[in-house]
Swiss-Prot record:
GO terms for biological process: actin filament organization; cortical cytoskeleton organization; establishment or maintenance of cell polarity; regulation of actin cytoskeleton organization; regulation of cell shape; signal transduction; small GTPase-mediated signal transduction. May be palmitoylated. This is Rac-like GTP-binding protein 4. The keyword Membrane applies. It comes from the Eukaryota. Inactive GDP-bound Rho GTPases reside in the cytosol, are found in a complex with Rho GDP-dissociation inhibitors (Rho GDIs), and are released from the GDI protein in order to translocate to membranes upon activation. It comes from Oryza sativa subsp. japonica.
């Protein structure tokens, strides 16, 4: 029990400003939905969580999506085990920025770290009054979310609503599972990297060449 509880998982949420990252974190950790928008006021959270019989110490990091934080935000990426990359189902711009901004940023600062793609504000996509008030709005469909997941290589795609708490727990359960039980392809990539490093090292020793790096 002690050994499993000592497993620490750092989960970092990223995505455009105002897509609901902070609300999702507050909802998950306190079962409350903040009615007012307050940009990124979530304190880092850490607690023991049990998923599929495994106890882990889950650490949650919130980040600001605004451009003013572009230099500071990557500091939170160091040591991340998994990213929750969020966009709003009622914001086409935030959906498009997953490919334009967030994937390049994560690949640059944290290559190889698994991503859970999340579509937030599910309740608004199905809210007729909200859609009538925003006649030019074209919500993101589930199929489009799945297509984006394939494009960026995310481990899974989940749609959630912090207001109704629908699938909020599922988001972070998925983030934990991808770390403690990596997908087969991810494990295979790690094994291949290890084999390539060993092969390169052995060849270097055999030929008595000076090694300056591992590939």
């Amino acid at each position: 029990m002690a050994s499993s509880a000592s497993r620490f998982i750092k989960c970092v949420t990223v995505g455009d400003g105002a897509v609901g990252k902070t609300c999702m974190l507050i909802c998950y950790t306190s079962n409350k939905f903040p009615t007012d928008y307050v940009p990124t006021v979530f304190d880092n959270f850490s607690a023991n969580v049990v998923v599929d019989g495994t106890t882990v110490n889950l650490g949650l990091w919130d980040t600001a999506g605004q451009e003013d934080y572009n230099r500071l935000r990557p500091l939170s990426y160091r040591g991340a085990d998994v990213f929750v990359l969020a966009f709003s189902l009622v914001s086409r711009a935030s959906y498009e920025n997953v490919m334009k901004k967030w994937l390049p940023e994560l690949q640059h600062y944290a290559p190889g770290v698994p991503i859970v793609l999340v579509g937030t504000k599910l309740d608004l996509r199905e809210d007729k009054h909200y859609l009538l008030d925003h006649p030019s709005l074209v919500p993101v469909t589930t199929a489009q979310g799945e297509e984006l997941r394939k494009h960026i290589g995310a481990t899974c795609y989940i749609e959630c609503s912090s207001k109704t708490q629908q699938n909020v727990k599922a988001v972070f359960d998925a983030a934990i599972k991808v770390v403690i039980k990596p997908p087969t392809k991810q494990r295979d990539r790690k094994k291949k990297k290890t084999r390539r490093g060993c092969s390169f090292f052995c060849k270097g020793v055999m030929s008595r060449r000076r090694l300056v790096c591992f590939k």
